[in-house]
């Protein structure tokens, strides 16, 4: 019972953090959460508390700590990249910083591209996908690269998802020939 109350208390404290919260307080709360997780590794709220560390860093807009965070699954990887991208997109105050922000955003989109290329299906990532696509990230060559990877893994569902992704976009850069080749890959599986 007491552990449930402590977990709820930690979760409530995370919700009060914002960009003006002193770093010492943010770090102390993060340490408390990590200690609780370590001491109560089988607690039913463990996943929620692990997520609350991520939420804490986003609320505090602590990009350095976010960069050090190692997500343990694809969904969290996408969430971390999205948070980093949102923070970089909102930090456009000075000209010198804009160049740095652009480099950081490009690096984030490059990480996203690697996830897109190497995974059949990604969790909801509309903001990153849109930014990546609008900057010319998804080329015909990359579509073929992903299709070959999926074909090599005998991933018929992944090829189907990729083909549907092509159908969804109006005025897509890809031509009908790419879609036809994807269809052939699917037929071979």
Where are the language model's segments positioned?
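Alpha-helical solenoid repeat scaffolds
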Residues: 1-189
